[in-house]
Amino acid sequence: MITVSNLAIQFGKKPLFQDVNLKFTPGNCYGVIGANGAGKSTMLRLISGDLASTKGSVTLGPGERLSVLKQNHYDYEESTVLNAVLMGHIELWNIIQEKDTLYAKADFSDKDGMRAAELEERFAEMDGWNAESDAAMLLSGLGIKEDYHHRLMKELGGKEKVRVLLAQALFGKPDNLLLDEPTNDLDLDTVMWLENYLGNYENTVLVVSHDRHFLDAVSTHTVDIDFGKVQLFAGNYSFWYHSSQLALRQQQNQNKKAEEKKKELLEFIARFSANVAKSKQTTSRKKMIEKLNIEDIQPSTRKYPGIIFMPDREPGNRILEVKGLTKSINGEVLFKNLDFNIEKDDKVIFLSRDPRAMTALFEIITGHEKPDAGTYFWGQTITNAYLPMDNSDFFNSDLNLVDWLGQFSSDTSENYIRGYLGKMLFSGEEIYKKTTVLSGGEKMRCMISRMMLRNANVLVLDTPTNHLDLESIQAFNNTLTNFKGNVLMSSHDHEFIQTIASRVIELAPKGMIDKITEYDEYIANEELKDRRNKIY
């Protein structure tokens, strides 16, 4: 259990939030949401003690352990993968280390024996005999193969290190668990494993995530950080979203009616204020105005970008034809002999256990890479716009945003470019910001602006929700759902896929599967599960 009392944090003269009083109880998972910069990660750091509060306190239940998903991937370079996970339970790890040191002594004394007995008792109480198997189970569930368990952390890639640190946070089933963006760099299958794990977790969990499906699957409550306030709501993200939208509409309607009534009363007063016979009625109406309740609706810190794709022309019946496409990297086959046709109105999610397969396919069909074998043909009516996963090559110049976006526009007037930047929430002096100082989310919004300028009828999107906040993802999602062209995409966002894609194509070294179906139906189909395993 975590109790937050009168908590406040201030940076300089600006308070981020204040007077926060919350209680987080066992058996519940709290999804922490808010716009970028609202203070989600700061809240977790305050609770963990990594950041000192300006005022207030955070207390845990007596004897309880708190575990945090660490963000520094290079802290354990000289440790084995398995040991890095065991270090997640620091008391148990220290006991293991002290035991090993004692038993390695050449002059093992009676005093050492007594200390060893104490350690063994505590070790057994903490289920130490199952520690390594429990750690291995977590690693396997998170997609780290057994071959890697005894390798050094420095031998792993960045995405694998993220998974090890997640296993470390989960290890030993801590009483209180803080997870900041735990689904980053996880594939869809691993996210599903984590959803199931947290869904059955009996202790207290706080999680920050931009994955709506994940939040809905694991959260029993929602912590909303907005207006500089921190509020707790029962229910998951979708319940909070629909409830808050309904409450806002109701307040707006109530205010509208009150404003109309006020106008009507003021008109009566203006008309009859000089009429002595109507003096009682005008006085009565003045009192009625005083009683009218018109509440201020505070502007939210949440901002939804205006993502709009307007194709110059309607696509014809021939969209894309792929024949015998094959691609390998360093002798490793990503896909072989791909054959498929994209039909009009298709919105396709491409899947693979190796994310390099989707990136390679998209790079080939957009002309940025060559296949090892095979061909592809775009229809004559087709214009495509590509959103690559790695956009670093687009931002290696020292241009400001206006000049940067102007490179991709036939109309380079500042007002025209400013309009597109404004749609993606760049306003005022921000449009003169240098591209070299942009955050990941800002770069992604620039890339989407670039796509909008293309007026394309086919959108090719490689993990398009990377670095975007919930509001941008929601806006992107809504636009693609209603888009009147074709969408070819990869994604790790379950909700994004489920609400957009009408067709699934899975790529693998030994074959492919092509189904016109929704994503949820595809992954639930038992017959397809066998077929999917056979193509890898």
What feature does the model see in each segment?
Residues M1-N255, D312-Y536:
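ABC ATP-binding cassette signature C-motif
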Residues Y103, Y241, A270-S273, A277, ...:
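A structural signal for long alpha-helical coiled-coils and helix-turn connectors
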Residues G113, L186, T283-I294:
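Extended non-transmembrane interhelical loops and adjacent amphipathic helices
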Residues A136-L142, E267-R271, K287-L292:
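Short amphipathic coiled-coil heptad-repeat segments
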Residues Q251-S273, K278-K287, K303, A524-Y536:
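ABC ATPase nucleotide-binding domains
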Residues A277-Q281, K291-T301, F377:
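Proline-centered turn/helix-capping motifs that create local helix->coil transitions or kinks
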Residues I297-E321:
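Amphipathic heptad-repeat alpha-helical coiled-coil/stalk segments that mediate oligomerization
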